[in-house]
C-alpha cells in the first residue's frame, strides 16, 4: 500500500448486482476515513469498430456530441445514484463526461468527477478494451488503487468442476492485480472481519495492511489460524497470538482469537461465512498457479466476500 493520505478504492461496475451492494461498504469506509473512489465500467470493443483505436475514439466522441449515452454509462449512472442516496455525492450533479487520453491506449477513457464532503475524489470511468481483466489491472495501476472491489454472483465451484469451469472474471483480476482485491458477495458492513494468519513472512507482510484496513473500516476483527494437523496446533496458536499482539500494538483489540485444525480452505470458508469479509494473504505462486493456493481457493469457494491482501 502506498503512502498516500487517503485510501484509494477502485470499484468495478458491471459484474452483476454485487458490485452495487459493495458501494454501501465503500461508503462505510468513507465515513470512517476519507477515501478516494473510482467507479469503473469496461466495455468490450464494439464489433463494428475494431479497425483501430482512433476510429473508436472519434466515433465515441461524436456520439457524446449528439447527446447519446454510450453503453456502460447507464451502469455508472446507477452507481452514482446509489452514492447520492448514501450522501457520498451531494450538491449539484455534473452530468458532463470528459475524454482523457491514455498512453498505450488510443481509445482513452471517459470520466466524470466529483468531490465528496470530506474532500475525497469520486470518479466515474468508462473504458473500452478487448480484455476486461487487463483494462481493470491497468486502471488500478493508473489510479494507484489500494483495493479493487469486483462483484461475483457466481455459485462456488468445487471438486472436479473446477478443472472444466471457466475461471470467474473476479478471480482473474485477483490473480493479475498488483493491489489487494475484494471478491464481493453480499458485501455488507457490520458483521466484522475474519483475518486469517500463519506464522510466516506472508502474514507478517500482510498485518500492517490488515491493521490499516481495520482502522479505515472501524470494523471488529477476529483472528483465525488453521493447522492442517493436530501436531501443528501450537504453531497456529503462536500465529494467532503474534497477530493479536501486532493489532494491540497498533491500537486495535481483536474481538476473538480462533485456532482450528483441518483443511485450511474448508475451515476458513465455513467459519468465515458469518463475517462481512474474510481477509487472506496473497500466495507467492505465479499468476497462472494462484488458483491452487489457499487464498484463491477460499475466494472461489466462499459464499461471502473475500479480500486477498497484497
Model-derived features with residue positions:
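Structural beta-alpha unit
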Residues: 1-4, 81-148, 248-296
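Gly/Ser-rich helix-loop-strand patches that form or flank binding pockets
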Residues: 5, 18-33, 128-188, 269-310
